[in-house]
């Protein structure tokens, strides 16, 4: 891993007004990116955003920086992250830029780049942009300055793309669906996609005001969706996060259906249709029930580190076409280049329509194991608790007791002095007791 100063695993992110998410930094970032990308030939960059109020300020700053470097900006307006990846490909733009902090609150924002083919920018290009940031900002000759324009049909183009991933011979006319768009970037996309495919749609979380993105709605908080599905006696609910790269579903009984279950349904349907190539990639946090259910179907399963970037890397390494995180990032490389909540949701709906089965019944082949997560704070600088003999001994005892019907995962938080203790097994009471036993051992260090 390179020692980049600004770019993390998912672009540049932070609180608006605090470095680096400030207008002056973002202007210079636009200029530096423009200088680097202009070397590659194309003169246009796609810029999309979610519905945060700060998006207006940041897209203006980016556009000014790009123009100073001689590149033109094409604005999409509020648009899901995967839509920007798609439009970057179809417009043959040199790059796409998304202004979003995904599932974070409105006061955060971030900048993420896509390359010309709709995938993440290569590390070398990000490093070149950072190197350019160290230079004094300059301006091309007036005649060479970049321009700005809007892609007026951006939403329509992406809606048609999404619909094209749903089989022509199927219809959603039998389904009543509640869709929750998190007051985010899918608010004008997802309801229209579902309606045009025939569904009876009830939309919530579709009234963005700049500050209500992800606020008690969307994929990170499905309580409002669960309540509405039950109240409307709907067949199911679908929730997206603020930038539309995650999807979580709710069955007609109000049960949450997470990314693990969604991947199970899509992988099993792919197998039935003879379209599954290779296996499926999850993460260290993927439920053991997923692994066992896929094993019963004869589908290979591999675990990547937590993070959709690492899931994609493992998929590419294996040559597999499907991967997911339990948080709802689902990557289907036969359809898209990045996690796409709408496209993933449509594949589940296709399985429902083709098999005339409810979402609840499609999930029935996979038994979710209870997963207990305990966060333990430790004193930074006092050594690594995970290396302590007492912690290792208790962990070994628990692993021996669980055998091959459970798992223990201990990992450090990347952002604060926390040890995350996760224990998974068939018996919830036993798993809870084991998790707290390990947590107590960590605290005692």
UniProtKB/Swiss-Prot annotation:
The active site is at residue 102. It comes from the Bacteria. PROSITE patterns: PGM_PMM (PS00710). It holds the Pfam family PGM_PMM_I. Mg(2+) binds at residues 102, 241, 243, 245. Autophosphorylation is inhibited by inorganic phosphate or EDTA. One of its GO terms (cellular component) is cytosol. Activated by phosphorylation. Can autophosphorylate in vitro using ATP, alpha-D-glucosamine 1,6-bisphosphate or alpha-D-glucose 1,6-bisphosphate. InterPro entries: A-D-PHexomutase_a/b/a-I (IPR005844), A-D-PHexomutase_a/b/a-I/II/III (IPR016055), A-D-PHexomutase_a/b/a-II (IPR005845), A-D-PHexomutase_a/b/a-III (IPR005846), A-D-PHexomutase_C (IPR005843), A-D-PHexomutase_C_sf (IPR036900), A-D-PHexomutase_CS (IPR016066), Alpha-D-phosphohexomutase_SF (IPR005841). Its EC number is 5.4.2.10. The modification Phosphoserine is found at residue 102. It catalyses: alpha-D-glucosamine 1-phosphate = D-glucosamine 6-phosphate. Its cofactor is Mg(2+). Keywords: Isomerase, Magnesium, Metal-binding, Phosphoprotein. Binds 1 Mg(2+) ion per subunit. One of its GO terms (molecular function) is identical protein binding. GO terms for biological process: carbohydrate metabolic process; peptidoglycan biosynthetic process; UDP-N-acetylglucosamine biosynthetic process. Catalyzes the conversion of glucosamine-6-phosphate to glucosamine-1-phosphate. Can also catalyze the formation of glucose-6-P from glucose-1-P, although at a 1400-fold lower rate. Belongs to the phosphohexose mutase family. PANTHER family: PHOSPHOGLUCOMUTASE (ALPHA-D-GLUCOSE-1,6-BISPHOSPHATE-DEPENDENT), PHOSPHOHEXOSE MUTASE. Catalysis proceeds by a classical ping-pong bi-bi reaction mechanism, with alpha-D-glucosamine 1,6-bisphosphate as an intermediate. This is Phosphoglucosamine mutase. It comes from Escherichia coli (strain K12). The lineage of its organism: Bacteria, Pseudomonadati, Pseudomonadota, Gammaproteobacteria, Enterobacterales. The gene is glmM.
């Amino acid at each position: 891993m390179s020692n980049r100063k600004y770019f993390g695993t998912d672009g540049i992110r932070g609180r608006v007004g605090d470095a680096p998410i400030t207008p002056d930094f973002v202007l210079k970032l636009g200029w530096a990116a423009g200088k680097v990308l202009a070397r590659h030939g194309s003169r246009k960059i796609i810029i999309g955003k979610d519905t945060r109020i700060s998006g207006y300020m940041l897209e203006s700053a980016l556009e000014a920086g790009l123009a100073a470097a001689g590149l033109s900006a094409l604005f999409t307006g509020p648009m899901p992250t995967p839509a920007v990846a798609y439009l970057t490909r179809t417009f043959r733009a040199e790059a796409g830029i998304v202004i979003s902090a995904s599932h974070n609150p409105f006061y955060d924002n971030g900048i993420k780049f896509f390359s010309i083919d709709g995938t993440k920018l290569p590390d070398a290009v990000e490093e070149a942009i950072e190197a350019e940031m160290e230079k004094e900002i300059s301006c091309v000759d007036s005649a060479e300055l970049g321009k700005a324009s809007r892609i007026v049909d951006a939403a329509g183009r992406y809606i048609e793309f999404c619909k094209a991933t749903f089989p022509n011979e199927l219809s959603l006319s039998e389904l009543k669906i509640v869709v929750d768009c998190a007051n985010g970037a899918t608010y004008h996309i997802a309801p229209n996609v579902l309606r045009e495919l025939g569904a009876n749609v009830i939309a919530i979380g579709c009234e963005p005001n700049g500050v209500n993105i992800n606020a008690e709605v969307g994929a990170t908080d499905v309580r409002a969706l669960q309540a509405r599905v039950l109240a409307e006696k709907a067949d199911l609910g679908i929730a997206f996060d603020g930038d539309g790269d995650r999807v979580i579903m709710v069955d007609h009984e109000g049960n949450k259906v997470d990314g693990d279950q969604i991947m199970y349904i899509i992988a099993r349907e792919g197998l039935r249709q003879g379209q599954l190539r290779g296996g499926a990639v999850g993460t260290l946090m993927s439920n053991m029930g997923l692994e066992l259910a896929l094993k019963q179907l004869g589908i290979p399963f591999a675990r990547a580190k937590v993070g959709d970037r690492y899931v994609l890397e493992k998929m590419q390494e294996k040559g597999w076409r499907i991967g997911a995180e339990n948080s709802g990032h689902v990557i289907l490389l036969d359809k898209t280049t990045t996690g796409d909540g709408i496209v993933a949701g449509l594949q589940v709906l296709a399985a429902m329509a083709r098999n005339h089965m409810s979402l609840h019944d499609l999930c029935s082949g996979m038994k979710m194991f209870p997963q207990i997560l305990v966060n333990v704070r430790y004193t930074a600088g006092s050594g690594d608790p995970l290396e302590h003999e007492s912690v290792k001994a208790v962990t070994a005892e628990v692993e021996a007791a669980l055998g091959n019907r459970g798992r223990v995962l201990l990992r450090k938080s990347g952002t604060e002095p926390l040890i995350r203790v996760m224990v998974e097994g068939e018996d919830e009471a036993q798993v809870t007791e084991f998790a707290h036993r390990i947590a107590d051992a960590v605290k005692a260090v």
